[in-house]
Amino acid sequence: MYHSVNVQVKQGTALFQWCDYNAHCANNLYNAALFRERQMMTSSKKTIHELTDNELEVMSEVENAKQWMTRPREVPPSGVMSYTFLNDVMRFNCNPDYYAEGFPIHCAQNILKQVTQDLNSFFKAVKKWNVAPWEFNGKPKLPEYKHKQGTTTFVSSNQECRIHQTKRGNYYCSLPKTKEIVHLGKSVPGKLIEVHISPMHGIYQISCVFDDEVETVQPSKKHERMVGVDPGVNTLLAVVNNCGMPNLLFNGRPLKSINQLYNKQIANIVSENT
């Protein structure tokens, strides 16, 4: 089961500057990757004479990347590139947002995964909308670009982040490409999986996700032992079962009386102050 330990980082600290810089890099990379995906999507529906300069530029990047791929790939008819394909395009063309100075490579790869996941979610939503449009408020829209000067959440893996313990028994998490650390206290709930860094109302929240490696108990698919619960007012709960155990009735009148007294006292206090 997964657990998270959250730490908030205020402005004016070196750790905040690290978070802010990388969140801007993540934002720029998301827009750059989405731009290439969208250009390939629109170009797949056009003839060579109808292509725009942006579409031609991106198609040139794709063709250049294909020359360096160990296993040749082709762009699907929809024009949507998979994560692996998109990663190769950004990598082999030495994209400046992908290789932004100080931006961890695993964080960059996770941003590309997020772009492809957002597009896959869009196509799934469109497919469902075509079948059951009444379940939506409107036709699903393509993922939008993020604010040009904005920030966005980025994720670092446990290959870049490490959990350490001091001589006093305190735990902390080291982060990639910085000497700053995240203090976690006297205990951690398991094995570190990944670290999420999210902008939040002028601060940053660092969420360390752990796996306690305890298997979640799956509910039984057999419905042999069942209980029915009917909540009410005078009868707070009526509980019946097919297990041969006594049925239960919980009297709700005492709680109802307490609630009425509470409401009366609140009304008296409000009337005295108005």
What role is predicted for each listed range?
Residues M1-T274:
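Nucleic-acid substrate recognition interfaces
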